[in-house]
């Protein structure tokens, strides 16, 4: 399946496919299947890039969840009780690590948003987050329109944003609704119920259904979006995922011995909460979605939908759209004029010209 067969906008219907070309009768083996081996060798040599953002109030286990996802000490959280003051403004911090498993390299960038929703007045607290996402689109666009550009443009665009919903047991808060409405138009959003072990199974399911109703009522289109299902297999798989979103998750980065085997989990006086046990939480569904089944699809939608929408708007604003065959104006706008569709000013900073391979 060609991952690039997506319409440039979710509002546009797919074009009817042209009549298929009849297969040519072959007289013998040619070796076409070797192309797959070539792609695999090249992919393992180049490695993969994946950029994830975690958003939510302090104390919801964002850092622990990232460490649990990748089974590494990707992010170190500040332990409670050290007198660390709450940030007065929203800050964004990014860390990049290279994770290797069975010869496959993954360049992982995690962006945390400490201070989100922690203030008494949270008006426009989403502006720095949306501005950061659009700034990464702008950096990629400025590299893309250069006459002489790098063979491999470093991709810092946010491929997925995991939004942590507090386990209140009621419904989405006005802050959640307002932020998700803005965020889902710019990036792939996967909401999760944080610290789900604080809810009973009945409370968890009722909370999930109320959140799903909130998402439908306020037209919040979270990932995986229904309009991007490419075939019947996608529809079957994604419909099951959509029915379970938001996933009720528990994070833990310590191993415990249970029935003679080591498991990741949280130890309580009632027992061990196993994060990879579906009877305890839905962390395996989140892990499979982000890594095992939909990682490349998250990157494809980011490039072909969200970034493409941003690129078209920016080129229209800057009058850089081609006016005829072969015509293109490559002069970028001045930094003070680089505005996103939401009038957030982006000043392009220094770029890390890292090598293609890592």
Curated annotation (Swiss-Prot):
Against CDD domains, the record matches this protein to: CDC_Septin (cd01850)
Q: Does the keyword Nucleus apply?
A: yes
Q: Name one GO molecular function term.
A: GDP binding
Q: What does this protein do?
A: Filament-forming cytoskeletal GTPase. Involved in spermatogenesis. Involved in the morphogenesis of sperm heads and the elongation of sperm tails probably implicating the association with alpha- and beta-tubulins. Forms a filamentous structure with SEPTIN7, SEPTIN6, SEPTIN2 and probably SEPTIN4 at the sperm annulus which is required for the structural integrity and motility of the sperm tail during postmeiotic differentiation. May play a role in cytokinesis (Potential).
Instruction: Locate the region Interaction with SEPTIN7.
Output: 46-319
> What is the name listed in the Swiss-Prot or TrEMBL entry for this protein?
Septin-12
A single BP term in Gene Ontology: spermatogenesis
PROSITE patterns listed in its UniProt record: G_SEPTIN
What family classification does the UniProt entry report for this protein?
Answer: Belongs to the TRAFAC class TrmE-Era-EngA-EngB-Septin-like GTPase superfamily. Septin GTPase family.
Give the span(s) annotated as G1 motif. 56-63
Identify the tissues in which this protein is expressed. Widely expressed. Expressed in lymph node.
Q: Which UniProt keywords apply?
A: Cell cycle, Cell division, Cell projection, Cilium, Cytoplasm, Cytoskeleton, Differentiation, Disease variant, Flagellum, GTP-binding, Nucleotide-binding, Nucleus, Spermatogenesis
Positions of the UniProt region annotated as G4 motif: 194-197
Pathology noted in the entry: Spermatogenic failure 10: An infertility disorder caused by spermatogenesis defects. It results in decreased sperm motility, concentration, and multiple sperm structural defects. The most prominent feature is a defective sperm annulus, a ring structure that demarcates the midpiece and the principal piece of the sperm tail.
Subcellular location as annotated: Cytoplasm; Cytoplasm, Cytoskeleton; Cytoplasm, Cytoskeleton, Spindle; Nucleus
Pfam family for this entry, one: Septin
Q: Which InterPro entries match?
A: G_SEPTIN_dom (IPR030379), P-loop_NTPase (IPR027417), Septin (IPR016491)
Which residue ranges are recorded for the region named Self-association (via N-terminus) to polymerize octameric septin 12-7-6-2/4-2/4-6-7-12 filaments?
Answer: 258-358
What domain of life does the UniProt record list for this protein's source?
Eukaryota
* Species of provenance: Homo sapiens (Human)
Signal peptide residues on this chain, from the entry's feature table:
none
Q: Which GO terms describe its cellular component?
A: cell division site; cleavage furrow; microtubule cytoskeleton; midbody; nucleus; perinuclear region of cytoplasm; septin complex; septin ring
């Amino acid at each position: 399946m060609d991952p690039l067969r997506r319409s440039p906008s979710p509002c546009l219907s797919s074009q009817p496919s042209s009549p298929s070309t009849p297969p040519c009768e072959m007289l013998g083996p040619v070796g076409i299947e070797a192309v797959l081996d070539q792609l695999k060798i090249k992919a393992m040599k180049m490695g993969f890039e994946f950029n994830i953002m975690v958003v939510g109030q302090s104390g919801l286990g964002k850092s622990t969840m990232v460490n649990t996802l990748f089974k590494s000490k990707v992010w170190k959280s500040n332990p409670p009780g050290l007198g660390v003051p709450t940030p007065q403004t929203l800050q964004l911090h990014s860390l990049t690590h290279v994770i290797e498993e069975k010869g496959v390299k993954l360049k992982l960038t995690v962006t945390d948003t400490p201070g989100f929703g922690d203030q008494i007045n949270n008006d426009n607290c989403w502006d720095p987050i949306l501005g950061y996402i659009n700034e990464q689109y702008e950096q990629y666009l400025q590299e893309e329109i250069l006459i002489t550009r790098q063979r491999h443009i470093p991709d810092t665009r946010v491929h997925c944003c995991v939004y942590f919903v507090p386990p209140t047991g009621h419904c989405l808060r006005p802050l959640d609704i307002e932020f998700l409405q803005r965020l889902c138009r710019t990036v792939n959003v996967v909401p999760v119920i944080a610290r789900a072990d604080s809810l009973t199974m009945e409370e968890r399911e009722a909370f999930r259904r109320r959140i799903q109703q909130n998402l439908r009522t306020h037209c919040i289109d979270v990932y995986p979006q229904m309009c991007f299902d490419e075939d019947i297999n996608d529809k079957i798989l994604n419909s099951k995922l959509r029915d379970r979103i938001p996933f009720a998750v528990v994070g833990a980065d310590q191993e415990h011995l249970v029935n003679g085997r080591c498991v990741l989990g949280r130890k309580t006086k009632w027992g061990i909460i196993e994060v990879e046990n579906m009877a305890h939480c839905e962390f395996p569904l989140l892990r499979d979605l982000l890594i095992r089944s939909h990682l490349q699809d998250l990157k494809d939608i980011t490039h072909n939908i969200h970034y493409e929408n941003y690129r078209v708007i920016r080129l229209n604003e800057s009058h850089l759209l081609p006016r005829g065959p072969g015509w293109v104006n490559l002069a970028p706008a001045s930094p003070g004029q680089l505005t996103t569709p939401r009038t957030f000013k982006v000043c392009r900073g220094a770029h890390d010209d890292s090598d293609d391979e890592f």
